Regions:
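Alpha-helical transmembrane segments of multi-pass membrane proteins
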Residues: 1-262
Length: 262
């Protein structure tokens, strides 16, 4: 089966891409001198590559150019870049995975879009509004990341397998349970960005727009990467992938900057 040119793996709820039968190995045809090989590359794979190229070019233009024009380079730019890029990638990975997971539980993607997105945005807003309290209560931005990662693991491994047993509940009860499961994760996710921006503002205020741009670029890049990732490994793996992303981002947070004062 691995040597077969087409993807014939069974479709399930974790990888609901019944329209996708091609393999990423066919991307090599894009660089072939044979026009027949180039024409065989499926449209979806072409689209992913095209989007990555366009967004990558925009990142170089909109992020790196302003950074070079700054009169003073921000300290430890790589660590700051890893932190804000990780926030953009991780947030969108969590959001997309939760939308798909709760779409099954709520019965329709539109319900998931309404309930999950509203819950996540409201919880993130609360986390951003009360970021100093959240970060201070947990003892620092890194401990917020540890808590968020623990919640993601607990819900993925313990809570989500139980959701099919609750499909007979009324819609209001399922929506309420969705809100309760999304709320703590969203509050933690919302505390990261304002904390990082506030710390950067104290140290290098002129680098704040650059950091915002890094986060924005990777937030736009993340959906494309998330689709490619989930098609290959599934939505469950996409949600779990947010764990190392946030851990790396938290470890990239400069230890000399007091997170609890954000």
């Amino acid at each position: 089966m691995r040597a077969y040119p087409l993807s014939i793996a069974p479709v399930d709820d974790d990888r609901p891409f019944f329209f996708r039968y091609s393999s990423w190995r066919e991307l090599g045809g894009l660089f072939s001198a044979d026009p027949v090989m180039r024409a065989r590359v499926p449209p979806m794979e072409r689209s992913v590559v095209a989007l990555l190229i366009v967004i990558g070019a925009a990142a170089l233009l909109c992020v790196q150019l302003p950074l070079r024009l700054l009169s003073r380079r921000p300290p430890r730019p790589r660590r700051h870049a890893a932190f804000f890029a990780g926030l953009g990638l991780g947030y969108m990975a969590v959001e997309i995975a939760l939308l798909q997971r709760f779409g099954l539980f709520l019965g329709h993607p539109n319900y998931a879009l309404s309930v999950v997105l509203a819950s996540l945005l409201m919880a993130s807003g609360l986390g951003a509004l009360h970021a100093p309290r959240v970060v201070g209560a947990l003892g620092g931005i890194r401990f917020v990341a540890y808590a968020v990662c623990g919640l993601i693991l607990a819900e993925t491994l313990l809570a989500f397998p139980l959701l099919p047993r609750l499909l007979t509940l009324p819609f209001a009860a399922r929506a309420g349970l969705t809100f309760l499961l999304v709320l703590p994760i969203g509050v933690g996710l919302g505390a990261f960005l304002p904390t990082g921006l506030e710390a950067l503002k104290r140290d290098t205020p002129e680098a704040v727009p650059w950091a915002w741009g890094v986060n924005g670029v990777f937030s736009v890049l993340a959906p494309v990467l998330s689709v490619a990732f989930s098609i290959t490994w599934g939505m469950r793996a996409l949600l779990l992938a947010a764990v190392p992303i946030y851990l790396v981002a938290a470890l990239s947070y400069p230890a000399s900057e007091p997170a609890s004062r954000a």
